[in-house]
């Protein structure tokens, strides 16, 4: 995988997925990189595409879904971040949803997901919800997850990504 030209294409709303994209770019040979940036026609020239997304309602963001649905005959490494990082099963469900948008002529050569921090407005919404007598039973767990996510992607997340890439 390291001897061919590649592109790193990503969507990042809060900077989390950008951190992963930067790490991949740091690891791989610079001279083999055809494109680094957001979804763009020139990024599709490479045979190997590293495609990064942020999670929106259990799937990739709409820009990424639109981009990947048009790809044909590519090798694809998926990477993404999600605010809720409770389990690998959750990450696998997201990846499964993303893969279902990819044409069968493409080959998935790898994948990686980790937790990512969320905007402060999310925590404020949770706290406001908790004040309501009809708040969800899991509201404390949601607030705890938000607080845990603040440091992600962290050094351990980036090291795990590096180990998958190399």
Identify the residue ranges that each predicted region occupies.
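FMN-binding flavodoxin-like domain, especially the glycine-rich phosphate-binding loop
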Residues: 3-4, 27-31, 46-51, 56-166
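The conserved SAM/SAH-binding core of class I Rossmann-like methyltransferase domains
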Residues: 9, 36, 79
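N-terminal beta-loop-helix "entrance" segment that forms/cooperates
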Residues: 18, 22, 40-55
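A short, well-structured beta->alpha microelement
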Residues: 29-42
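N-terminal beta1-alpha1 ligand-phosphate binding loop
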Residues: 2-27
């Amino acid at each position: 995988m390291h001897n061919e030209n590649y592109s790193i294409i990503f969507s990042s709303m809060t900077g989390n997925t950008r951190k992963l994209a930067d790490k991949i770019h740091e690891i791989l040979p610079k001279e083999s990189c055809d494109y680094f940036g957001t979804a763009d026609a020139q990024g599709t020239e490479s045979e190997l595409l590293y495609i990064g997304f942020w999670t929106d309602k259990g799937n990739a963001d709409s820009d990424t879904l639109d981009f990947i649905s048009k790809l044909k005959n590519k090798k694809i490494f998926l990477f993404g971040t999600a605010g809720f990082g409770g389990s690998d099963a959750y990450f696998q469900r997201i990846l499964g949803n993303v893969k279902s948008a990819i044409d069968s002529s493409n080959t998935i050569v790898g994948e990686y997901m980790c937790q990512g921090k969320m905007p402060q407005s999310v925590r404020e919404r949770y706290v406001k919800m908790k004040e309501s007598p009809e708040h969800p039973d899991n509201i404390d767990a949601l607030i705890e997850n938000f607080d845990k996510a603040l440091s992600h992607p962290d050094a351990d997340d980036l090291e795990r990504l590096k180990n998958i890439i190399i």
